[in-house]
Amino acid sequence: MNLFEDTNPRALKDLLTEIHNRVAVLPDFQRDFVWEPSATQELIVSIANNYPAGSILRVRDAKRVFAAREFEGAPPLDGTKHTFLVLDGQQRMTSLYQAFYGVGEHRYFLDLNKLIDGTDFEEAIFHVRASTKWAKAREDFDLQADELLLPLSVLKGGAGGFGQWSRKAARRLDNEKRIKLEDALDLIESKWIQAIDDYHSPVVTLSDKTE
């Protein structure tokens, strides 16, 4: 009997969507989320640089033997029938879900001015507590665009989400400045955003015959 259903890499954005839709959940015995935001930030830097960032182990849970719960920050399970239990990789996936979906105790931003100036990605990303006045003020698009601060949650829509945000930001400027900003943001998209959008994580899926 083959315990492995498959070992194929999965697109990160698809894995995060599964968490949001409660297709992938946690066994209730898993420990709570404990990662520091600095660790989340380092993980996002690795992904933007297409570095290995660990694998995911999950099991198809057709029998639903174990009590399950949603990932921290995801919508409540509320009777939703899940497909997978994530056995290893919880901390990484929770941190990425919260960062890209804009939930949890911290918010993550990219300073696009720094990226335009050629600064490395790790120097351009930062986090703040979601409860601060500063973070709440930057829920406003006009302020984001004025300061060229991109909430990482925009990227849950992948490169398309970034494209929509950047076009909307550039349209606020006159022709010459608009074209210059569009060109600069296109370079950021091709160098960094597309890498995040294309990122795949190794996933080992155990079959529902696993005991």
Residue ranges of model-derived segments:
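Basic- and aromatic-enriched surface patches that contact anionic nucleotides/nucleic acids
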Residues: 2-37, 41-211
